[in-house]
Amino acid sequence: NGVSIDGLKVKDYSLMYGSNIALTIDSSGRTTQPNQPAFLAQPTSAQLNLVPNGYRDIDLGTERFDRGSNFASSVFTAPITGVYQLNMSIGLQNNVDKNADFYQIELSTSNRDYAWIIDPNFEASIGTPVYWHSTLSVLADMDANDTAKIRFYQGGGSTQTDIGTNTYFSGFLVA
């Protein structure tokens, strides 16, 4: 039956509160926290011919995992106040428009936006890039019910750049 102290219970290599397992330790000393928020999502299909001069939320319809069920409709909602590791990678493909003034990928939270910006014509001697991958990782301070999503912005240029299914957004509670 384990040992209980003020509702906290130690039983079968697990630390529990009520019937919720907070921490499990295996015979080698490895630990897992099954209720620790964590997610990884990707687009279900490519997002084609993005229109320049406007923010575009990235559609992430395929969840690889979602511990805690805090990711829905391409948005992560922090279940508790804490510091979260958030990661994104956007794969641009199919005739990336090097005539655009700039590309901006953004990890947007309720408290702050984190951006990566580049001029796609930084090397005039190359032809039109077919693929371009950019990543961004941050430790973000989030309060309970704050949200995070990823966005894309193309300044100028033509409607020709696509976002591929190799794009992803992931995160987990650190502290």
Residue ranges with predicted function:
Residues 79-81, 107-114, 140-147:
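A short, structured loop/turn motif at beta-sheet edges
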Residues 1-34, 156:
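Beta-strand-rich receptor-binding modules of extracellular spikes/adhesins
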Residues 115-121, 134:
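Acidic/polar, compositionally biased interaction segments
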Residues 126-147:
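Short, surface-exposed tryptophan/glycine-enriched loops
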Residues 151-158:
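Short beta-strand-plus-loop segments that form exposed binding edges in beta-rich domains
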Residues 21, 72-74, 138:
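Short, conserved secondary-structure segments in the cores of folded domains
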Residues 17, 27-99, 105, 109, ...:
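Terminal (often C-terminal
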